[in-house]
UniProtKB/Swiss-Prot annotation:
This is Phosphomethylpyrimidine synthase. Pathway: Cofactor biosynthesis; thiamine diphosphate biosynthesis. It holds the Pfam family ThiC_Rad_SAM. Residues 492-511 are annotated as: Disordered. It catalyses: 5-amino-1-(5-phospho-beta-D-ribosyl)imidazole + S-adenosyl-L-methionine = 4-amino-2-methyl-5-(phosphooxymethyl)pyrimidine + CO + 5'-deoxyadenosine + formate + L-methionine + 3 H(+). The lineage of its organism: Bacteria, Pseudomonadati, Spirochaetota, Spirochaetia, Leptospirales. The keyword Secreted does not apply. One of its GO terms (cellular component) is cytosol. It comes from Leptospira borgpetersenii serovar Hardjo-bovis (strain JB197). GO terms for molecular function: 4 iron, 4 sulfur cluster binding; carbon-carbon lyase activity; zinc ion binding. Its cofactor is [4Fe-4S] cluster. Its EC number is 4.1.99.17.
Amino acid sequence: MESTQEFQVPLKTIRLTDGTEYQSYHTEGSLSDKKPSDYKNGIPKIRKEWIRTRLDRGDTNHSQMYYAKKGIITEEMRYVALRENMNPEFVRLEIACGRAILPSNRNHPELEPMIIGRNFLVKINANIGNSALGSSIEEEVEKLHWAVKWGADTVMDLSTGKNIHETREWILRNSPVPIGTVPIYQALEKVKGKAENLNIQVFLDTLEERAEQGVDYFTIHAGVLLHYIPFTANRVTGIVSRGGSILAKWCLAHHKENFLYTHFDEIIKVMKKYGVSFSLGDGLRPGSIADANDKAQFGELETLGELTKRAWEEDIQVMIEGPGHVPMHLIKENVDLQMKLCQEAPFYTLGPLVTDIAPGYDHITSAIGAAMIGWFGMAMLCYVTPKEHLGLPDKEDVKQGVIAYKIAAHAADLAKGHPGAIKRDNLLSKARFEFRWEDQFALSLDPETAKSFHDETLPQDRMKTAHFCSMCGPHFCSMNLTQELRKFAQEKGMEEKSEVTICNRKKESGK
């Protein structure tokens, strides 16, 4: 164990009117008391001393997998164990075998450590970032605040517009959650948008720049191989990954193998130096139901499994990105094959969307697939907003996407039987049956919306204790009628009579 330093982890305490307290996982952490306008002050650097100790002793590999394999329980692992209510040694073992990752760049001291793995709570990622069409630095920091307020466990900065470096710097200095990026976007900007002019040195320079700033994980599309590209020719929607299409264009322009694949060992060196984790990108993921589970998708997945082994040999953490658009009956095949080919490295999926017919509602079409794939063993879900396929999401879209995916993640935790997952459901159900409206609001994922919907028709304070809502009114509420029935049965001793009746019937039937 690195130290015996004591520390506290962020938890959100919900105090109920019956005196009960519920503590939930809290992603907002030290951002809770800050305003986006204060972004130039940053947030506390809670990992500063932990990192300094490792630098002072000359560590050359800053990956949590490196320490885990050496039998060391780091402060980050202890922190995660407290957040997840798990044993620190279990956390270490999961990281050591590659079944979980703890993304934590040595240059992101503001990070409040979290873990991604199938044996832990299902996590969600939110994407933010500017485009060539607009959005300021302050707006992007505000999106970060907004995403973690509603429960994003990690955030990816996908900026492609102006001031990319400065925008990313302030996102990192204000982020209590891991930040991921896709370096190929900025590399493309450096060669004036011409994919054929990309080369490994431009990419490595971009990688080093981002790692130096503190980015915790990189999406690297190293599995888009030259001989897989023809498999996409007859697809309905071709190659839908931006990174995948950029690298496919480079491969075809030069008729050479993907330079991210051929120079993978050089990329590993940068990851090792800063403790950055791989998020191996699915550049050939299906972009429509018709293309799901095809030869291109699964061919790339096999290569990602090979690259995972190469990264693990150097003690670098890896998670695998997944689809995409997949109908419900094909989802389990994705998980089973990923676990087999990638040796149970954490699976990180975009949805998947289970139908293509609902533009404007793809946060719903994808949350259905997300709940299913989470149940089957996926570790982290990348959210989809209502604007998917239509435009750049705004603040409200970010909220809608995060809430939809928090529902999917929690549903998966319930289905997997994660310890403690059902407690919040039980507390809310009890509050609902007892007509404790304020407690129902407080326990919901979005208290503001729950309260506003209730108050649209019954805004008066006295209605916060009423034994009905506007759906049924005072005379048709099933829960109120059930309470009256129970009271009547208790007064008349009906429970004892019922037990006697059941006993007599069993005797008559010879049971």
